[in-house]
């Protein structure tokens, strides 16, 4: 079996993975800013890095996985004011919602979920270190900014040179800055802001900037240098670039060894945005599709590729997952342990060790399903369930998935309806009213239900 290789955004190539401490992996992922419900782009970040930590653990590593929560931000302050509620109430409500969404998608809890507001002292210490190193200055408006041009390595992650950069999207233009590209480390308090977003500091009352939050939490929980830092491609610049500048500017050594970024999510080949009316929260998607279908849809694409969300692609994912569960119906896995030396398992591991190549890994799962259809082998069923379980799939009884409603919450009503229709069809056949029996079968098929007549008069059903 080949060793794990990871595409390192910083190096712009796949590299063999060698942790700082043998057998142990320290990993940080940028989490959610909790002022609204999580959308399908957040779902991809959750599922992708859940996959990464699952495979690392399955490979024998001891993993310390940190995914932060941004619970102080301009958007949070604005939303709380609009709602007329406290910031703590707003953020707790959406943290609870985020946890529910993550659990529905089969995302395991990180080892640590630090909230930014609990790490302000560490942020202040980091800013003081930057000031001592000549990289931070207080501007005329009271903010403390980072002097980008005084950090020689700025731009190495994004591949952008300072001369090519301009103050654009997500880069504040502020007349108090020495350079438009400088970014805020500490925001001075505004009179209209609530007291719960004001902290005392040597520079005056204020609150942390977005970028310093992640640097401080990561270094506090994982050390000044750690193995993997992940997040969405949209965070590569400026957020992750600025994290490097802050962390390495303070410590004077490498911050992160491997940078991982998952690709964008598009909707029907367009950028997802509220203005285009194609913005979907996880909850909206789960109202239409089973949560495992959504997870499978995300995992079928390579994490670095663009993911195109559409009903057609979700329908295809549901049908594909149905094929695998159908293969397991009536074939109970044997009780032996998963055999990672078996041929399918070796190919699965090869795929996962090749920068978490889930399209190839999923192809191996389909090969197993096809062989189970032919052989009805309990040993192969065990391999399929075991390998799929590593990536958080196929862990329900087959009949439970095959009977599941299109949307979460519909299962009970749908099952009752189908059972009643099957009984009516049985009675029609007993009365030799075969036209009525055929009509019931056709009506159920229109609703996405397939009936399968078995010996002895038994009828089973599943989703199409």
Swiss-Prot record:
Catalysed reactions, as listed in the record: tRNA(Cys) + L-cysteine + ATP = L-cysteinyl-tRNA(Cys) + AMP + diphosphate
Gene Ontology annotations for the cellular component aspect, listed alphabetically: cytosol
Binding site for ATP: 274
Motif ('KMSKS' region): 271-275
The protein's enzyme class: ligase
Gene Ontology molecular function, alphabetical: ATP binding; cysteine-tRNA ligase activity; zinc ion binding
Motif 'HIGH' region, residue range(s) on this chain: 32-42
Compartments in which it is found: Cytoplasm
Binding note for cofactor: Binds 1 zinc ion per subunit.
InterPro entries associated with the record: Cys-tRNA-ligase, Cys-tRNA-synt_Ia_DALR, Cys-tRNA/MSH_ligase, Rossmann-like_a/b/a_fold, tRNA-synt_1_cat_dom, tRNAsynth_Ia_anticodon-bd
Chain sites annotated for binding Zn(2+): 30, 214, 239, 243
Chief site of localization: cytoplasm
Family annotation (NCBIfam families): cysS
PANTHER family on file: CYSTEINE--TRNA LIGASE, CYTOPLASMIC, CYSTEINYL-TRNA SYNTHETASE
Oligomer status and interactors: Monomer.
Protein family: Belongs to the class-I aminoacyl-tRNA synthetase family.
Protein name: Cysteine--tRNA ligase
């Amino acid at each position: 079996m080949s060793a794990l290789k990871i595409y390192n955004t910083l190096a712009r190539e796949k590299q063999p993975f060698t942790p700082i401490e043998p057998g142990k992996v320290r990993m940080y992922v940028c989490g959610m800013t909790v002022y609204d419900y999580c959308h399908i782009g957040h779902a991809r970040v959750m599922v992708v890095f859940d996959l990464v930590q699952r495979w690392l653990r399955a490979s024998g590593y001891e993993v310390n996985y940190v995914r932060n929560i941004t619970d102080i931000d301009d958007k949070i302050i604005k939303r709380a004011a609009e709602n007329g509620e406290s910031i703590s109430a707003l953020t707790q409500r959406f943290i609870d919602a985020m946890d529910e969404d993550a659990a529905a998608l089969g995302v395991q809890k990180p080892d640590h979920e630090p909230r930014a507001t609990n790490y302000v002292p560490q942020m202040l210490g980091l800013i003081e270190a930057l000031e001592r190193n000549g990289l931070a200055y207080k501007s005329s408006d009271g903010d403390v900014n980072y002097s980008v041009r005084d950090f020689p390595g700025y731009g190495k992650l994004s591949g952008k040179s300072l001369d090519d950069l301009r103050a654009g999207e997500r880069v504040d233009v502020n007349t108090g800055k020495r350079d438009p590209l400088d970014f805020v480390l500490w925001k001075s308090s505004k009179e209209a802001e609530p007291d719960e977003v004001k902290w005392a500091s040597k520079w005056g009352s204020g609150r942390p900037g977005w970028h310093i939050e992640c640097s401080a939490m990561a270094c506090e929980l994982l050390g000044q240098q750690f193995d993997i830092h992940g997040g969405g491609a949209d965070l590569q610049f400026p957020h992750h670039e600025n994290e490097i500048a802050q962390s390495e500017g303070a410590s004077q050594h490498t911050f992160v060894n491997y940078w991982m970024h998952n690709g964008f999510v598009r909707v029907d080949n367009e950028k997802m945005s509220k203005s285009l009316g194609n913005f979907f929260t996880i909850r909206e998607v789960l109202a239409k599709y089973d949560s495992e279908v959504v997870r499978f849809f995300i995992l079928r694409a390579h994490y670095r590729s663009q993911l195109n969300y559409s009903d057609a692609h979700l329908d295809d994912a549901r049908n594909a997952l149905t094929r695998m569960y159908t293969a397991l119906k009536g074939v109970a896995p044997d009780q032996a342990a998963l055999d990672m030396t078996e041929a399918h398992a070796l190919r699965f591991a090869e795929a996962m060790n090749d920068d978490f190549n889930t399209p190839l890994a999923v192809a191996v799962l389909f090969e197993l399903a096809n062989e189970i259809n032919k052989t009805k082998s309990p040993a192969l069923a065990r391999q399929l369930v075991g390998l799929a379980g590593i990536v958080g799939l196929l862990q329900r009884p087959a009949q439970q998935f095959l009977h599941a409603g299109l949307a979460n919450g519909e299962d009970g009503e749908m099952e009752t309806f189908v059972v009643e229709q099957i009984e009516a069809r049985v009675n029609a056949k007993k009365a030799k009213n075969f036209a009525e029996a055929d009509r019931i079968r056709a009506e159920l098929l229109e609703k996405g239900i397939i009936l399968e007549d078995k010996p002895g008069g038994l009828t089973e059903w599943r989703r199409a």
